[in-house]
Amino acid sequence: MVWMTVFHFCFDLSYFKVIVEDFYRDPFWTWQRSSIVSLFLLCAGMGQAVALAQGQTAYRFWRRWGQVMACALLVSIGSWFMYPRSFISFGVLHGMALMLILVRFGFSRLPTAALWGLGAVAVALPFFIAHPFFDTRTTNWVGLVTRKPLTEDFVPILPWLGPMLWGCALMRIEAVRAWMQRPLLPGVRPLSVMGRWSLSYYMLHQPVMLGALMAARHFGWL
């Protein structure tokens, strides 16, 4: 969450022309974005594995899924006002909503080795298979595109299902579960709030930063 916040703050500074950076082509920024999304989905997969192990009810799953989907729709609407030509139609929350269903009702029933293997297949497949059919806004969510669509955020099922499957597999390892249950160090304990309220933080951090930068520009501080 901290890394994501710093990344988005730099993106916002670029949006307000405070710094000049190419967030769409510069490897320094594109690799960071890929790493942040990968960690986000890895943690989502780990969380889903924990929820299943604890016997999460269907009601609680669908309530959480509804929250994710509602936030995804808000992101689409908000991005349409800010970037009408490149609004977000299938970003990280849209992808997560669909992937959570796939993992919950399908892939979670597979053995751990299969999760590792299918995760690798999901990551590799777009490098070998692509077709213009998947280049439209109604089909690019699959991920087998021949070119990246014009959008501010794009997290299709392929390859991004891979990290979520790996997260699910990772939490089946006893040593990992034991390590995750250790008490947090006092210095990082306050950061756990972001983890417990991850969706709320994700939705609020950008409006807060954008509002602060707009206010700073209004008062001539930028």
Positions of predicted regions on the chain:
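Alpha-helical transmembrane segments and their immediate juxtamembrane cytosolic regions
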Residues: 1-222
